[in-house]
Amino acid sequence: MEARLSETLGLPSPNLNHCHFPNEFNSLFTHFSDLTSVQSPIVRNPKLKTKSSQKPPKFSANFRRSDPPFASTSISDPTHEKPGPEFLKWIKPASRSSPRIQTLIKQLSVWERAIIGAGAGGLAGAFTYVTLLPLDAIKTKLQTKGASQVYSNTFDAIVKTFQAKGILGFYSGVSAVIVGSTFSSAVYFGTCEFGKSLLSKFPDFPTVLIPPTAGAMGNIISSAIMVPKELITQRMQAGASGRSYQVLLKILEKDGILGLYAGYSATLLRNLPAGVLSYSSFEYLKAAVLEKTKQSHLEPLQSVCCGALAGAISASITTPLDVVKTRLMTQIHVEAVDKLGGAMYTGVAGTVKQILTEEGWVGFTRGMGPRVVHSACFSAIGYFAFETARLTILNEYLKRKEESEANVAADS
């Protein structure tokens, strides 16, 4: 029955190896798309033209002539005959399954991968930080010294912030966020991609240690840019008056360039474990998903889920470190100290001791709820944006590189 139907439609006889539905639906769909797109229906007997031989077979709404974006398979299977001009109009020239493209990907240098990662990271960082700035503002208000006397809970902090400054109160320091997050995220992801590519070239280096090592490298370098950005943003969220550049000038006037790095040690203390946990968790989850689905890259929903889980794990474990860092960064603001009262914090150890004395262990969990939500959302959006931007830049770069090499070959 199947053989007779295939002969009538001008298709090859069905291969039972492609019909293990639903586990191999992707393979079956790709194979079917290749055949219907590349090959024309063959008329077995020209004298007997039936409706079946005159019209192409109809497809249900669930079948499409091309794979959706981020699909695991590509219809440009090199095992099929060379497609014609009409086919080339709608297939992507930089299809990841092309042997030539795979060769170009393998030939990418460490620096090329780092630059692609930096470009994608900068775009993803700016988009993500601005999107989630309101959650970060509430988290900072709850973690500031004396916040328990001003805000009874998260909802109270939201209401009072809106009553005091309106919707703009949730976007204090947004200009510093855009500038700082773009550069810091570009440096972070660029360094991580550089580290992954470099460490992968050493066969004796344990594969399982590549993600955490690359994440640590990215955090150490990017923190030098991130700390001044966070300092200005959190000073404004804690009540400092003026615009971002005015707060920056006040810090430089009072404390010099070193004033921009108040809480740098606490930031590293938080960012290193948080960054290693988040980045490593995402890379491990990503590897597990790709291994299970046999895909070359994550689909959007998979990036969101892996990122959210990685962010939640990291935030819940590192909230105490974030509390210490926030106290050190915000307590220097004189107006806030005079308003809320209390002694100044002196270093990481002194801050930990003072929090234990005044608030007990509960003090280290301040703002955990908003922080976990913020981190899960941040990682979900951030890794999704990064993966999307990275694939877009990579495909465009490979396309241009392929065209350039083709032009050189044609000229020669």
Swiss-Prot record:
Family classification: Belongs to the mitochondrial carrier (TC 2.A.29) family.
Disruption phenotype: Reduced vegetative growth and reduced expression of ferritin.
Transit peptide: 1-92
Summary of the function given for this chain in its UniProt record: Probably involved in iron transport into chloroplasts.
Subcellular location: Plastid, Chloroplast inner membrane
GO biological process: iron ion transport; response to iron ion
Disordered: annotated span: 43-83
Organism: Arabidopsis thaliana (Mouse-ear cress)
Protein name: Protein MITOFERRINLIKE 1, chloroplastic
InterPro entries: Mitochondrial_sb/sol_carrier (IPR018108), Mt_carrier_dom_sf (IPR023395)
Keywords of the record: Chloroplast, Membrane, Plastid, Plastid inner membrane, Repeat, Transit peptide, Transmembrane, Transmembrane helix, Transport
Transmembrane segments annotated in the record for this chain: 115-135, 167-187, 208-228, 262-282, 303-323, 365-385
Cellular component, GO annotation: chloroplast; chloroplast envelope; chloroplast inner membrane; plastid
Induction context: Up-regulated by iron excess.
Higher taxonomy: Eukaryota, Viridiplantae, Streptophyta, Embryophyta, Tracheophyta
Solcar repeats: 112-198, 206-288, 298-392
Superkingdom assignment: Eukaryota
Protein's membrane topology: Multi-pass membrane protein
Tissue specificity of this protein: Expressed in leaves, developing flowers and siliques.
